[in-house]
Regions:
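Domain-terminus/edge residues, biased toward the C-terminal soluble/receptor-binding domains
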Residues: 153-157, 165-170, 174-299
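N-terminal start-of-chain detector that recognizes signal peptides
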Residues: 9-10, 59-60, 86-89, 149, ...
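Hydrophobic alpha-helical segments, especially transmembrane helices
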Residues: 10-11, 65, 241
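Enrichment for repetitive, rod-forming helical segments
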Residues: 16-17, 71, 266-269
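Short alpha-helical segments used as structural interaction elements across diverse proteins
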Residues: 6-7, 61, 256-259
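N-terminal secretory targeting signals
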Residues: 1-36, 40-43, 48, 79-81, ...
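Alpha-helical protein-protein interaction elements
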Residues: 14-16, 41, 61, 150, ...
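Active-site-adjacent loops and short helices of periplasmic peptidoglycan-processing enzymes
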Residues: 21, 25-174, 184
C-alpha cells in the first residue's frame, strides 16, 4: 500500500507539471476536450490574448450565430419578413434536442424562429431558418461557408445550420470571435436579443441558455452558448464597460462552471488590455450573394 500511495503521488505531481500554468491567470485544469480561447478588442479587432485560437474545433451551437446573422441579413435586405410564416419540414421537426418541438407542417413566423434559435438554442428552429433562406439545409450550409469566407473566417466550414456534430463542420475561436464582432456592429438592432434572459415564443417562455453568465458578469450582453459531446462546453461572449467592448470565445470546457470561470478570466484580460477609445474601426461591407461559387472565396 505505501508503494502504491507513493507512486500515485508521483504520478499526480507529473500530471500537474505536464498541465502547466496558463499565462495571464487563466485556470489550469486537466483538459478533457481540445481547448481554445481568444479575446478581441471589439472596436479595433485587435487580438488581446488567445490560446490555440486558430485550431479547428467543433463549434457546436455557436454555429447558430451564423444562421442568425444570415437571417438578419435576409430580413434587412427584404428577402424575408419577420412576420413571414414558414412551413416546418420533416427534416427540421426531427432534429434532436435542444429544440422547440415544432410539428411537421406547422407554420411558424421568422420572428419566433429567431427567438427560439437565439435564446433556447433550438436546433429545429435553426434548421427551419436555413431551409427558409436557401430551400435546403445543405444549400444553406454552403451559403454559411461562403459568408464565413467573405468575413475572413478562413478556417470555418459549415455542414448544417445548428451545429450538431458533422464531419468537416469545424471552426476556430478566432473565426467565431470575428463573427461575434460582425453581429454586434452589423446588426445592432437585433444584437440586443442575445442579452435577454428570456423571450416569449408561441405562448411559451424560453429561457436564455446563457442567462446565468449574463447575470454574473458586469456588462455582459451576449452572445451564444454551445455544447456537444464532441465539442465540450463552448461560449462566445461580449461585454461592454464604459467605452470598452470586448468579444471573447472559449472552446472545449469540461463543464458549464469551468466555461464560466474561463470566460470571466478571459474578459477580465480583455478589459485590462482594450483601448479606452470609443472609435470603432469600420467593418468592410459583406460582399456576398447566395449564388456565389464557394471556389471564388478559396482561390
Amino acid at each position: 500500500m505505501p508503494i502504491i500511495s507513493s507512486f500515485a503521488k508521483k504520478l499526480g505531481f507529473c500530471l500537474i507539471l505536464l498541465a502547466g500554468p496558463f499565462s495571464f491567470g487563466l485556470s489550469t485544469p486537466l483538459l478533457a476536450y481540445p481547448f481554445a480561447t481568444i479575446v478581441l478588442d471589439a472596436a479595433t479587432g485587435e487580438k488581446l490574448y488567445g490560446q490555440n485560437s486558430n485550431t479547428k474545433l467543433h463549434p457546436a451551437s455557436l454555429t447558430k450565430m451564423m444562421t442568425l446573422y444570415l437571417t438578419f441579413r435576409e430580413v434587412e435586405e427584404g428577402r424575408l419578413r419577420l412576420d413571414q410564416r414558414v412551413l416546418i419540414s420533416k427534416n427540421a421537426s426531427r432534429e434532436p434536442p435542444s429544440k422547440f418541438g415544432y410539428k411537421v407542417g406547422q407554420k411558424v413566423s421568422i420572428r419566433f424562429l429567431i427567438r427560439a434559435a437565439a435564446i433556447r438554442s433550438a436546433n429545429d428552429a435553426a434548421t427551419a431558418l436555413g431551409e427558409a433562406i436557401s430551400g435546403s439545409e445543405a444549400e444553406f450550409a454552403n451559403y454559411m461557408t461562403r459568408a464565413a469566407r467573405s468575413m475572413g473566417m478562413d478556417s470555418t466550414t459549415f455542414k448544417n445550420a445548428n451545429g450538431l456534430t458533422a464531419s468537416a463542420h469545424l471552426s476556430t475561436a478566432r473565426d467565431m470571435a470575428l463573427l461575434g464582432r460582425r453581429l454586434i456592429y452589423d446588426f445592432p438592432e437585433y444584437y440586443h436579443l442575445f442579452g435577454r434572459s428570456s423571450v416569449v415564443s408561441l405562448g411559451r417562455t424560453l429561457y436564455n441558455t446563457n442567462r446565468k453568465f449574463l447575470a454574473s458578469y458586469s456588462g455582459a450582453d451576449g452572445i451564444k452558448t454551445g455544447f456537444t459531446s464532441a465539442a465540450g462546453f463552448n461560449l462566445a461572449a461580449s461585454a461592454k464597460r464604459g467605452n470598452k467592448r470586448v468579444v471573447a470565445v472559449v472552446f472545449g470546457s469540461g463543464s458549464v462552471k469551468l466555461r464560466t470561470r474561463r470566460m470571466t478570466e478571459l474578459l477580465n484580460i480583455g478589459f485590462a488590455k482594450a483601448s479606452s477609445s470609443s472609435r470603432q474601426n469600420r467593418l468592410p461591407p459583406l460582399k456576398l450573394s447566395k449564388s456565389d461559387d464557394l471556389n471564388d472565396f478559396e482561390s
